[in-house]
């Protein structure tokens, strides 16, 4: 079903959110903008919005089929999705299966270390503050959500990790880590929001042992490795191939 695009509600680094005729729904546009290091590094990559929109839609559908609540409703076009309107919780929830990135910069943990159990971290979502990491006590001090809601978010995140790890393992991809955002829908239920794509997930190709060539996510942009679109296309291709085999 096509929805009429209304006024701009919010514009972030990678997406625009528009009102639509149903006040409980929004239209989300995925942009081609690429940013890293809290937008200190910027570029525009043709086709990125389309790929992230389609990948996110496929993964939201997968999660919904497995009983995980998300804001996703349907694709409007290759770069627009229709979603339930939510009140965003200003938290970024990161779960790590393999050590890389900031974890290795900030601790003595070696790159590539398997984290068992996976490490779950909270960050306060605020660009001006640099999205600082939150200790358990700071999280409680901010009082963004209740203790029971924190437990709900952790349970959902761990379940998502289990589902996606197994799913991508079958696609010869290692799910290194990923970030989730959450919000409350009109019924007051906690649901996954934002996106799930190579912009906020790290994927390593299991069929490639080269530490740079195996990267199939936004680290290609962060590290100036090139081939960003090729990497994102490869993720979508494997997802679509799996979908074709399953149907």
From Swiss-Prot:
It is an enzyme of class 6 (ligase). It holds the Pfam family SAICAR_synt. The keyword Zinc-finger does not apply. It catalyses: 5-amino-1-(5-phospho-D-ribosyl)imidazole-4-carboxylate + L-aspartate + ATP = (2S)-2-[5-amino-1-(5-phospho-beta-D-ribosyl)imidazole-4-carboxamido]succinate + ADP + phosphate + 2 H(+). Its EC number is 6.3.2.6. Pathway: Purine metabolism; IMP biosynthesis via de novo pathway; 5-amino-1-(5-phospho-D-ribosyl)imidazole-4-carboxamide from 5-amino-1-(5-phospho-D-ribosyl)imidazole-4-carboxylate: step 1/2. It comes from the Bacteria. The keyword ATP-binding applies. One of its GO terms (biological process) is 'de novo' IMP biosynthetic process. Keywords: ATP-binding, Ligase, Nucleotide-binding, Purine biosynthesis. CDD domains: SAICAR_synt_PurC (cd01415). One of its GO terms (molecular function) is phosphoribosylaminoimidazolesuccinocarboxamide synthase activity. Belongs to the SAICAR synthetase family. This is Phosphoribosylaminoimidazole-succinocarboxamide synthase. It comes from Prochlorococcus marinus (strain NATL2A). The lineage of its organism: Bacteria, Bacillati, Cyanobacteriota, Cyanophyceae, Synechococcales.
């Amino acid at each position: 079903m096509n929805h009429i695009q209304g006024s701009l509600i919010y514009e972030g680094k990678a997406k625009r959110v528009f009102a639509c005729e149903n006040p409980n729904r929004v239209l989300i546009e995925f942009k081609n903008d690429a940013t890293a290091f809290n937008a200190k590094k910027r570029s525009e990559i043709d086709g990125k919005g389309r790929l992230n929109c389609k990948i996110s839609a496929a993964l939201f559908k997968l999660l919904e089929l497995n009983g995980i609540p998300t804001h996703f409703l349907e694709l409007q076009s290759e770069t627009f999705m229709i979603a339930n309107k939510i009140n965003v919780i200003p938290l970024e929830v990161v779960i790590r299966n393999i050590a890389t990135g900031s974890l290795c910069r900030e601790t003595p943990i070696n790159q590539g270390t398997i984290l068992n159990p996976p490490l779950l971290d909270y960050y306060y979502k605020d660009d001006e503050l640099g999205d600082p990491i939150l200790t358990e006590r700071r999280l409680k001090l901010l009082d963004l959500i209740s203790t029971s809601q924190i437990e709900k978010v952790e349970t959902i995140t761990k379940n998502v990790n289990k589902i996606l790890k197994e799913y991508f393992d079958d696609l010869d991809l290692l799910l290194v880590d990923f970030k989730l955002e959450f919000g409350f829908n009109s019924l007051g239920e906690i649901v996954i929001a934002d996106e799930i794509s190579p912009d906020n997930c790290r994927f390593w190709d299991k069929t490639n042992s080269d530490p740079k060539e195996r990267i199939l996510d936004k680290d290609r942009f962060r590290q100036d490795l090139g081939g960003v679109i090729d990497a994102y296309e490869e993720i979508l291709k494997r997802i679509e191939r799996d979908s074709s085999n399953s149907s």
